[in-house]
């Protein structure tokens, strides 16, 4: 007898004229963790699949000699493949880090390749509207962590480009990867009133909704694990959620099997806050690599020119090499970013099973 199939019975996620039946965005994870396989599978289930463009072409022929060219090629290739996998369902987009040296090129490539949405963080995407152009159908969203950052970006876009965000991703302190909080704040995550911040941001964006006569959906991210978390976010007034870490332990995730197993085997005490060459704190799994960089600066034999502001002579390690080593399977000597709830992940699943589980739990 076939298992019961669950359908999302709540409101869909509407971003302008675009619509995703299930208001779940799969967060972008780089290097190489969320590419076409994962993003396409999430969209196929009615959600929003997000491809990370950070060194996306790491496994393309000629990458060592021409990273920029291989990354542009891979953006096109993976967006096209994700759309094929999705079979017309959901939405497909990209996550592009502001800190990237070739940020502008990645944005333009994603637009040309037909990305439905661009989500941009690791810095505030001040000039994103200019890069996508006025007539572009691709929807854009900044990642923010505070009311202050939200006010700044919305005011900037309004003043300089006479437009506003198509949606906003609010990322909390329990997220993985790079975090928009200080080291001091991250020492006591419980002291941060994130719910209050979300409500303030929702109130803040209403003036821009009125001015531009359009809705600006709000997506809550960071530590979203199950249906209880999704329900809570929606009750706060959010229009959807972004989930990343839970999708790592799926068969469709683009990472190596060793990377997925590192998540499954992780315990709460294995997770720590680190300093990234990007200039922001990050959350990652403790391993031999992190222990080494605490003691001394790692020699950088090759610069990949991946970050806009990076001095190889001063940074403690090469983030590109560390992330590529990890995604390929060397999880002891690479950098494994993760969310605060990774210790709750204990088994492998599929995107379909996970989405079904989340939908069923949210409906309870």
Q: Which stretches of residues belong to each language-model region?
A:
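Residue-level detector of alpha-helix initiation sites
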Residues: 33, 224-225
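Conserved active-site-proximal phosphate/metal-binding subdomains
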Residues: 25, 175-219, 225-364
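Active-site entrance/lid segments in N-terminal catalytic domains of soluble metabolic enzymes
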Residues: 2-208
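Residue-level detector of intrinsically disordered, flexible termini
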Residues: 1-2, 325
């Amino acid at each position: 007898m076939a298992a019961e199939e669950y359908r999302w019975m709540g409101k869909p996620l509407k971003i302008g004229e675009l619509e995703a039946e299930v208001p779940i965005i799969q967060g972008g994870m780089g290097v190489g963790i969320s590419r076409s396989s994962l993003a396409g599978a999430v969209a196929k289930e009615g959600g929003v699949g997000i491809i990370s463009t950070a060194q996306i072409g790491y496994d393309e022929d000629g990458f060592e000699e021409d990273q920029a060219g291989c990354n542009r090629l891979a953006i096109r290739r993976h967006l096209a493949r994700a759309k094929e996998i999705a079979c017309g369902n959901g939405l497909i987009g990209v996550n592009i880090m502001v800190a990237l040296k070739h940020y502008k090129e990645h944005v333009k490539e994603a637009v040309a390749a037909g990305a439905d949405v661009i989500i941009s963080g690791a810095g505030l995407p001040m000039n994103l509207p200019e890069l996508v152009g006025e007539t572009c159908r691709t929807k854009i969203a900044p990642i923010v962590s505070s009311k202050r950052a939200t006010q700044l970006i919305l005011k900037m876009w309004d003043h300089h480009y006479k437009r506003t965000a198509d949606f906003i991703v609010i990322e909390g302190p329990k997220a993985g990867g790079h975090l928009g909080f200080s080291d001091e704040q991250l020492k006591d995550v419980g002291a941060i009133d994130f719910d209050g911040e979300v409500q303030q941001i929702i109130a803040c964006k209403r003036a821009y909704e009125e001015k531009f006569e359009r809705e600006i959906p709000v997506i809550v991210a960071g530590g979203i694990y199950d249906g209880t978390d999704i329900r809570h976010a929606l009750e706060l007034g959010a229009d959807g959620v972004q989930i990343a870490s839970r999708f790592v332990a799926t068969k469709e995730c683009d990472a190596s099997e060793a990377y997925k197993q590192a998540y499954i085997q992780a315990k709460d005490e294995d997770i720590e806050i680190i300093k990234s060459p990007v200039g922001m704190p990050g959350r990652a799994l403790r391993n031999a690599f992190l222990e080494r960089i605490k003691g001394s600066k790692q020699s950088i034999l090759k610069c990949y020119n991946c970050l806009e502001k990076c001095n190889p002579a001063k940074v403690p390690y090469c983030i590109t090499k560390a992330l590529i080593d990890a995604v390929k399977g060397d999880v002891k000597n690479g950098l494994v970013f993760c969310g605060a709830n990774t210790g709750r992940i204990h088994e492998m699943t599929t995107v379909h099973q996970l989405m079904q589980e989340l939908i069923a739990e949210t409906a309870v």
